[in-house]
From Swiss-Prot:
Domain Ferritin-like diiron: 1-145
Binding site residues for Fe cation 1: 18, 51, 54, 127
Any single Pfam family the record assigns to this protein: Ferritin
Cofactor(s) listed: heme b; Fe cation
Protein name, per record: Bacterioferritin
Keyword Transmembrane: no
Any single GO BP term: iron ion transport
Native organism: Salmonella typhimurium (strain LT2 / SGSC1412 / ATCC 700720)
Class of enzymatic activity (EC top level): oxidoreductase
Top-level taxonomy: Bacteria, Pseudomonadati, Pseudomonadota, Gammaproteobacteria, Enterobacterales
Length: 158
């Protein structure tokens, strides 16, 4: 089915956002793991996998609309050097992605591409959940102090 060119362009932009997020969150997860912060590792790793699933949805939709998925035009990763910087970098990425999603959703609705719109609304709900988690973690750092926060991110195994 031949899709609207602007929808395909939006989907490719959103795909690019997801590809950056996959790599950024995966690297952050492994850095957290290396530092012994297993709870942060677990969440970031899960988020990386979720972003991969979102990317897969975009790829399938672009192909269905007879477009070509662009997996080469990647933005810059925002890799932090400490926990707070990493969480802030992830939050910036999520906020930008949510902004792009809202714009694409509005356009899809205006051209009556309800399937693309509904897919993007579902993904936006996931992104808003991640934004909420990141904001909560940054609030905890501010309230508890970094040392107490870091201590709370260590999972003792049997």
């Amino acid at each position: 089915m031949k899709g609207d060119v602007k929808i395909i362009n939006y989907l490719n932009k959103l795909l690019g956002n997801e590809l950056v997020a996959i790599n950024q969150y995966f690297l952050h997860a492994r850095m957290f793991k290396n530092w012994g912060l297993t709870r942060l590792n677990d969440v970031e790793y899960h988020e990386s996998i979720d972003e991969m699933k979102h990317a897969d949805k975009y790829i399938e939709r672009i192909l269905f609309l007879e477009g070509i998925p662009n997996l080469q035009d990647l933005g810059k990763l925002g890799i932090g050097e400490d926990v707070e910087e990493m969480l802030r970098s992830d939050l910036r990425l999520e906020l930008e992605g949510a902004k792009d999603l809202r714009e694409a959703i509005a356009y899809a609705d205006s051209v009556h591409d309800y399937v693309s719109r509904d897919m993007m609304i579902e993904i936006l709900a996931d992104e808003e959940g991640h934004i909420d988690w990141l904001e909560t973690e940054l609030d905890l750092i501010a309230k508890l102090g970094m040392q107490n926060y870091l201590q709370s991110q260590i999972k003792v195994t049997d």
